[in-house]
């Protein structure tokens, strides 16, 4: 059985990979990292990161679900929720 913390770690790592690719700079992502403040991601960059993550995980992230996402941990949880429903 796959442990949930392993799945979360994978999601956080992939969020970092996507953010690094989109932003063109190294990004250290932790669960508590605030997407706008700590990662310095604006709304356009966030949408590009979301598209990268959708491709990586073969999921579709509804825009209305993003309204509650403030931290990388929130985004990781959303990804994991969508992956378990797919």
UniProtKB/Swiss-Prot annotation:
Name this polypeptide is given: Probable acyl carrier protein CCNA_01221
Record bears the keyword Phosphoprotein: yes
Gene Ontology cellular component annotations, sorted alphabetically: membrane
SUPFAM superfamilies: ACP-like
Any Pfam family the entry gives: PP-binding
Keyword Lipid metabolism listed: yes
Modified residues (O-(pantetheine 4'-phosphoryl)serine): 43
Record Gene3D superfamilies: ACP-like
UniProt-listed GO biological process terms: sphingolipid metabolic process
Disruption phenotype: Deletion mutant cannot form bacterial ceramide. Mutants are impaired in growth at elevated temperatures but are resistant towards the antibiotic polymyxin B.
UniProt keyword list: Lipid metabolism, Phosphopantetheine, Phosphoprotein
Function: Involved in de novo bacterial ceramide synthesis.
Pathway: Lipid metabolism; sphingolipid metabolism
Domain Carrier: 6-83
């Amino acid at each position: 059985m796959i442990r949930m913390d392993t799945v979360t770690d994978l999601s956080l790592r992939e969020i970092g990979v996507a953010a690094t690719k989109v932003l063109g700079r190294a990004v250290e992502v932790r669960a508590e990292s605030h997407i706008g403040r700590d990662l310095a991601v604006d709304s356009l960059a966030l949408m590009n990161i979301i598209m990268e993550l959708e491709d990586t995980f073969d999921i579709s992230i509804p825009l209305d679900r993003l309204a509650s996402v403030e931290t990388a941990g929130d985004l990781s949880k959303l990804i994991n929720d969508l992956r378990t429903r797919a």
